[in-house]
Amino acid sequence: MPKKPARTRRPAPLAGRARKKNLLDSLGLRTVDYKDTATLRVFISERGKIRSRQVTGLSVQQQRQVATAIKNAREMALLPYPGQGIKP
């Protein structure tokens, strides 16, 4: 019976890439406030969607904090919901 070819190991996730810069640390913030819409807009795309951790470079806890703040700001009508842009 022929042997199966040996599988090669996948490279480490950050082997050749530099780590993404943490946006909250670069802005000098420890906590996120839902009333600070200028800061929250950094974490929202042009379409109004929350940017992912891979894009923003946030930790898990920071991403949760930002997402909660954005959702609270949307409820208070400080930020738009996704899909409420200009329609053709």
Curated annotation (Swiss-Prot):
Keyword Zinc-finger annotated: no
Keywords, alphabetical: Ribonucleoprotein, Ribosomal protein, RNA-binding, rRNA-binding
UniProt xrefs under Gene3D superfamilies: Ribosomal protein S18
Pfam families found in the cross-reference section: Ribosomal_S18
Gene Ontology BP term (one): translation
Any one cellular-component term (Gene Ontology): cytosolic small ribosomal subunit
Superkingdom of this protein's organism: Bacteria
Annotated InterPro entries: Ribosomal_bS18, Ribosomal_bS18_sf
GO molecular function, one term: small ribosomal subunit rRNA binding
Subunit text: Part of the 30S ribosomal subunit. Forms a tight heterodimer with protein bS6.
Record's function text: Binds as a heterodimer with protein bS6 to the central domain of the 16S rRNA, where it helps stabilize the platform of the 30S subunit.
PANTHER family attached to this UniProt entry: 30S RIBOSOMAL PROTEIN S18 (PTHR13479), SMALL RIBOSOMAL SUBUNIT PROTEIN BS18M (PTHR13479:SF40)
Protein family: Belongs to the bacterial ribosomal protein bS18 family.
Name of the protein: Small ribosomal subunit protein bS18B
